[in-house]
Structure formats: C-alpha cells, structure tokens
C-alpha cells in the first residue's frame, strides 16, 4: 500500500483519514469487522453518507469488504492491518528524523553554552 512514503498512495490514505467520521469507522473496525449499517450508527451518519465514506476508505486501501456467508447482499467491512502498519511506519520515520534534529539542536546549544 505505502511502499513510497512520499508518494501518492500515502497521501490518499492520509486524505481518507482526514475526515472525523472516517476516523470513527477505522476505530470501530479496529475492534471488529462490521456491516455498513452498524458503522453508520457508530459514526453517527446516515447510511448513504456512510456508503460514500466506505468507498473512500476502500479506494485508499484502508478497508476491505466481503459478502456475508448467509446473505450475499450483506457486506462486512474489515480494517486492513497493512494500511495501519504502513502509516505507522511512515510516522515512526518522521518522528525519528524529528528526534534526531532535536538531539542535534540540544548538542549545539550545549556546545555554545560552554563557550
């Protein structure tokens, strides 16, 4: 999903996550797979709005869907672990660079303070 951390795939994932209702969907799916109607209730949005949110999350590769075993009309949505891992890896890289910059700044200030 996010092989190139600076690429358009990561941007699509972050853009998809930039909506509070979609964040609530991701939180709900992190607990268990769910149907669209249940997700709409959890996110506090009407069913048609949830359908739009789910299309965005599917297109970004954040969730997957499958047809219900007993009823093919029912779709069950699941969070893709890979999408969460990829975003976390990118954030960890950004944090590591930031931490390195802070260490370098601290060392600089300490050197200057000794003069």
Spans of model-derived segments:
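Charge-dense, helix-prone N-terminal extensions
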Residues: 35, 46, 63, 107-110
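Beta-hairpin "wing" of winged helix-turn-helix
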Residues: 38, 59-74, 78
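Short, hydrophobic-biased segments on the C-terminal half of alpha helices
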Residues: 54-55
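N-terminal helix-turn-helix DNA-binding core of bacterial DNA-binding proteins
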Residues: 2, 8-49, 74-85
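Amphipathic alpha-helical dimerization/coiled-coil segments
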Residues: 1-8, 27, 82-115
């Amino acid at each position: 999903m996010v092989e190139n951390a600076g690429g358009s795939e990561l941007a699509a994932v972050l853009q998809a996550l930039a909506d509070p209702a979609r964040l609530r969907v991701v939180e709900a799916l992190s607990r268990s797979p769910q149907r669209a109607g249940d997700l709409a209730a959890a996110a506090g949005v009407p069913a048609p709005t949830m359908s739009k949110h789910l299309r965005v999350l599917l297109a970004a590769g954040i969730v997957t869907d499958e047809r219900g075993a007993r009823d093919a009309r029912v779709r069950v949505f699941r969070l893709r672990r890979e999408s969460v891992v990829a975003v976390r890896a990118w954030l960890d890289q950004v944090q590591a660079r930031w931490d390195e910059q802070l260490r370098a700044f601290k060392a600089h200030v300490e050197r200057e303070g000794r003069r």
